[in-house]
């Protein structure tokens, strides 16, 4: 290729350098991309001169088209570059690589060829009977043929058991994977579980109990069977321990009457799985409570997960949903749910409690509290009525404040309340709550008739002579007791004086001394 980029020259090269690598991208094709394409052609056994013509690019595209879907990044880049060069040779105006690839595929109908090839491949891989290979038993040439379970199905079952750890999801997963299976296939699904042998032992005990109950209710007919007649299945036959695959197929599809041993065995296994799930998930629905900061949606998920593992009739589960779901919610959600009325739907509850406990709900409550407080502050002063006129504390006049008063500043004592001196220079004691009255320093009395200005004031109603006055009686008792004490003190004093007189010297000489 001479200079390494002789595939394009002149105007073709200018057009090539204007095409973008990606839609709406900044990078564009350069000469180095042509040099790289020439080197890559040798790896696929193609000559580099094929890039110089439209027909040569067409041959390269035909070679690379089958390899492009599963090829490497280098092969895909070479295919895209050949499409761009073909568009330049064919004078097809394109803006980027993606548009060039679409133009080439539409011109050579490569899209239709790919669809036909994929359709042909699917037809060759489909089973002859027209049934899906995922179904264990298929009808081929008017004969029922058993197909073993695919490793993908078994792997999905084992992965579910290992991840969910016998959660409530295991039972519906088993129902989906074992649809249409025979007893042989169900046993195969149970045998691939390596761990959890304790759970499998519980499952076996449930299967044995159900098989014994089947044998008790389905007694085999007495006497030998007619020639060519198929025997009735026993409990062990349904469990797949004493029956072959062909016998299970005959009982399921050709017997008269038909007995779907696979479906019956699935019921037994589902009962055992439900018991295992209940034992491995001891948490009851009654114990599910919403946390103080837990979203209501997460609480509902935990509640229904525990309810799914609960072995109870449907009416009991409905009662649990209607009562316990609201009863065990936190106070915030419970207050909202009770406002929805009787028997609200789950959708209404989820919408009503959306965001409760989160930052948005807390911010909303904070805004409501602040608005209520602001309203209380605004409404509070209005109840006291309008404020009165301003009063000066210096001169006592209305209309101005003390700092605006033009009168001389008066000094007032805070102890006695008089004007002219300060509290530190006050000679009087501190005034009590009654202040200083006309009684001076004496204790004020509560009786009006003892006041100086009301000495001659008499009560208008006459006193009741027969009325009992406890205060007067008590005062009389105090007066009598005081009189007795004074008399005792006087008598004691006189006795002491007499004793002193007896021991004096005047008694020795008589009255003449």
Swiss-Prot record:
Miscellaneous comment as given in the Swiss-Prot or TrEMBL entry: This is an African green monkey isolate.
Motif, Nuclear export signal: chain positions: 16-22
Pfam families: Gag_p17, Gag_p24, Gag_p24_C, zf-CCHC
Higher taxonomy: Viruses, Riboviria, Pararnavirae, Artverviricota, Revtraviricetes
Zinc fingers typed CCHC-type, residue spans: 390-407, 411-428
The encoding gene: gag
Organism the protein comes from: Simian immunodeficiency virus agm.grivet (isolate AGM gr-1)
Cellular component, GO annotation: host cell cytoplasm; host cell nucleus; host cell plasma membrane; membrane; viral nucleocapsid
Cross-referenced PROSITE patterns: ZF_CCHC
Lineage: superkingdom: Viruses
Domain notes: Late-budding domains (L domains) are short sequence motifs essential for viral particle budding. They recruit proteins of the host ESCRT machinery (Endosomal Sorting Complex Required for Transport) or ESCRT-associated proteins. p6-gag contains one L domain: a PTAP/PSAP motif, which interacts with the UEV domain of TSG101.
Annotated motif Nuclear localization signal, positions: 26-32
Disordered as annotated region, ranges: 115-135, 215-234, 481-513
Post-translational modification as stated in the protein's UniProt record: Capsid protein p24 is phosphorylated.
Name assigned to this protein: Gag polyprotein
Keywords annotated in UniProt: Capsid protein, Host cell membrane, Host cytoplasm, Host membrane, Host nucleus, Host-virus interaction, Lipoprotein, Membrane, Metal-binding, Myristate, Phosphoprotein, Repeat, RNA-binding, Viral budding, Viral budding via the host ESCRT complexes, Viral nucleoprotein, Viral release from host cell, Virion, Zinc, Zinc-finger
Function: Matrix protein p17 targets Gag and Gag-Pol polyproteins to the plasma membrane via a multipartite membrane binding signal, that includes its myristoylated N-terminus. Also mediates nuclear localization of the preintegration complex. Implicated in the release from host cell mediated by Vpu. Capsid protein p24 forms the conical core of the virus that encapsulates the genomic RNA-nucleocapsid complex.
Family membership noted in the UniProt record: Belongs to the primate lentivirus group gag polyprotein family.
Gene Ontology BP annotations: viral budding via host ESCRT complex; viral translational frameshifting
Residues the UniProt record annotates as site (Cleavage): 135-136, 432-433, 447-448
Motif PTAP/PSAP motif per record, residues: 459-462
SUPFAM superfamilies membership: Retroviral matrix proteins, Retrovirus capsid dimerization domain-like, Retrovirus capsid protein, N-terminal core domain, Retrovirus zinc finger-like domains
Biased composition (Basic and acidic residues): 481-501
InterPro entries, per database record: Gag_p24_C, Lentvrl_matrix_N, Matrix_HIV/RSV_N, Primate_lentivir_Gag_pol-like, Retrov_capsid_C, Retrov_capsid_N, Retrovr_matrix, Znf_CCHC
Lipid-attached positions, N-myristoyl glycine: 2
GO molecular-function terms, A-Z: RNA binding; structural molecule activity; zinc ion binding
């Amino acid at each position: 290729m001479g200079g390494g980029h002789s595939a394009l020259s002149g105007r073709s090269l200018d057009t090539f350098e204007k095409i973008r690598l990606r839609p709406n991208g900044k990078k564009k094709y350069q000469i180095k991309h042509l040099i790289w394409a020439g080197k890559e052609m040798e790896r696929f056994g193609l000559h580099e001169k094929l890039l110089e013509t439209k027909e040569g690019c067409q041959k390269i595209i035909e070679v690379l088209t089958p390899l492009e879907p599963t090829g490497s990044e280098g092969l895909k880049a070479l295919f895209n570059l050949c499409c761009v060069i073909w568009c330049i040779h064919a004078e097809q105006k394109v803006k980027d690589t993606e548009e060039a690839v679409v133009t080439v595929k539409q011109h050579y109908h490569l899209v239709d060829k790919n669809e036909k090839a994929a359709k042909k491949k699917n037809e060759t891989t489909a089973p002859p009977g027209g049934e899906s290979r995922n179904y264990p038993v298929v009808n081929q040439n008017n004969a029922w043929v058993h197909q073993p379970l695919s490793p993908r199905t078994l792997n999905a079952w084992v992965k579910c058991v290992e991840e969910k750890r016998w959660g409530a999801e295991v039972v519906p997963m088993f129902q989906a994977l074992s649809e249409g299976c025979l007893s042989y296939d169900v046993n195969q699904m149970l045998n691939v579980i390596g761990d959890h042998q304790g759970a499998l032992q519980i499952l076996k005990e449930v299967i044995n109990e159900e098989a014994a109950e089947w044998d008790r209710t389905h007694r085999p007919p007495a006497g030998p069977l007619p020639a060519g007649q198929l025997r009735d299945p026993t409990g062990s036959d349904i469990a797949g321990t004493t029956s072959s695959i062909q016998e299970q197929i005959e009982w399921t599809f050709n017997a008269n009457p038909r007995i779907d041993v696979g479906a019956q065995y699935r019921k037994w296994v589902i009962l055992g799985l439900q018991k295992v799930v209940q034992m491995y998930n001891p948490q009851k629905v009654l114990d599910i409570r919403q946390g103080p900061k837990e979203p209501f949606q997460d609480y509902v998920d935990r509640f229904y997960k525990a309810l799914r593992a609960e072995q109870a009739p449907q009416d009991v589960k409905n009662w649990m949903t209607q009562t316990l779901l609201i009863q065990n919610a936190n106070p915030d959600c419970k207050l909202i749910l009770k406002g929805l009325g009787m028997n609200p739907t789950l959708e209404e509850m989820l919408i009503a409690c959306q965001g409760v406990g989160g930052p948005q709900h807390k911010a909303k409550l904070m805004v409501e509290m602040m608005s209520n407080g602001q309203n209380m502050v605004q409404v509070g002063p209005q109840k006291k009525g309008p404020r009165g006129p301003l009063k000066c504390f210096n001169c006592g006049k209305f209309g101005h404040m003390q700092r605006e008063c033009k009168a001389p500043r008066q000094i007032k004592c805070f102890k006695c309340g008089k004007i002219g001196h300060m509290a530190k220079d006050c000679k009087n004691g501190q005034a009590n709550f009654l202040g200083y009255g006309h009684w001076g320093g004496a204790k004020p009395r509560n009786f009006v008739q003892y006041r100086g200005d009301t000495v001659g004031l008499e009560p208008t109603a006459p006193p009741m002579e027969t009325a009992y006055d406890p205060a007067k009686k008590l005062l009389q008792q105090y007066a009598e007791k005081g009189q007795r004490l004074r008399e005792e003190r006087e008598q004691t004093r006189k006795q002491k004086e007499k004793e002193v007189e007896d021991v004096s010297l005047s008694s020795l000489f008589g009255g003449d001394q």
